[in-house]
């Protein structure tokens, strides 16, 4: 049985938000998700909002936004760098069965761009 290997660091252009340097990118076959850890460079800009980062990553990775969840964004005081951990699931159903409720809510819920009724 082979051990999943980490891919080499690569750069992801995130438009106005800056750019990300992927440090770890591997597929977890047990959970059926891709786990990405990256350094987000956003010099002279605020830390990006989760929903905007999630939308841009969905566009760049070519997957549905319902399959992507930002686990954390950690930014040092005054730094234009943030460490970001992202989970990209094979299906939205798997994401909902593994991600804690508070993470789903932090990421804008199940349908992040659906308007609230009422």
Swiss-Prot record:
It holds the Pfam family Ribosomal_S24e. This is Small ribosomal subunit protein eS24. InterPro entries: eRP_eS24_sf, Ribosomal_eS24, Ribosomal_eS24_CS, Ribosomal_uL23/eL15/eS24_sf. GO terms for molecular function: structural constituent of ribosome. PANTHER family: 40S RIBOSOMAL PROTEIN S24 (PTHR10496). GO terms for cellular component: ribonucleoprotein complex; ribosome. Belongs to the eukaryotic ribosomal protein eS24 family. HAMAP family: Ribosomal_eS24 (MF_00545). It comes from the Archaea. One of its GO terms (biological process) is translation. Coiled coil: none annotated. Keywords: Ribonucleoprotein, Ribosomal protein.
